Regions:
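Short, Lys/Arg-enriched N-terminal segment that forms or immediately precedes the first helix
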Residues: 2-13, 79-89
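DNA-contacting interfaces and partner/effector-binding or oligomerization modules
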Residues: 7-20, 108, 136-138
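Positively charged, polyanion-binding regions of nucleic-acid-associated proteins
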Residues: 16-32, 94-110
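A structured, charge-rich N-terminal accessory region that forms the first stable segment of a protein
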Residues: 27-71
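Short acidic, hydrophobic short linear motifs in intrinsically disordered regions
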Residues: 32-43, 109-121
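Short amphipathic alpha-helical interaction segments
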Residues: 45-54, 122-135
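Charged low-complexity interaction tracts in eukaryotic proteins
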Residues: 56-97, 135-162
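Basic, low-complexity intrinsically disordered segments
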Residues: 66, 70-72, 76-78, 112, ...
């Protein structure tokens, strides 16, 4: 009887398939926005990591609405003067995430924002994001007429906003 031989693989075997970022770019130029499953389908892969690797090669944005599930190209987004763009009720910002966008909007405002005002401006609920920004000392809040007015963390800027 021949001795039993055990072979060990030392390296992971990777598929030799080459993926191109152009497949993602073509899809996003045509449809303007897409979610991860569509991007994976356009590339012909089931691996999210592959899509993220190819997205790095492109100038792209993720939505601040819909938990960042939508993607678009910078060249497709028609950003307004306040740094926002929407397509089919999906919102994107030059500032990136909802936290960064809310902070930038409040800091740039002539006067602070009440939650409802910022909700209307950004078209999403901002209460939790504002609470986190205050907790992280990125913004402050002042009680005005029974409601919280959110202002910049910088004391000089905050005095101007009140």
């Amino acid at each position: 009887m021949a001795p039993l031989r055990i072979y060990k693989r030392k390296d992971a075997i990777m598929r030799p398939t080459d993926f191109s970022a152009e497949a993602i770019a073509t899809l996003l130029r045509k449809q303007k926005i897409a979610r991860m499953p569509k991007l994976m389908g356009a590339m012909g892969t089931n691996a999210r990591r592959t899509v993220f690797r190819k997205l790095k090669e492109l100038a792209y944005r993720t939505s601040y609405s819909h938990c960042g599930r939508y993607y678009t190209l910078d060249e497709v987004a028609e950003i307004d003067a306040q740094g926002l763009w929407s397509y089919r009720e999906v919102w994107f910002s030059v500032y990136g995430t909802l936290l960064s966008t809310a902070a930038a909007m409040v800091e740039a405002a002539a006067v602070g924002y009440f939650v409802e005002e910022l909700d209307n401006r950004l078209h999403v609920g901002t209460k939790d994001a504002l609470r986190k920004l205050v907790g992280d000392a990125r913004l402050t809040r002042e009680k005005v007429a029974g409601q919280f007015l959110f202002c910049a963390a910088d004391s000089r800027r905050r005095r101007q906003q009140l």
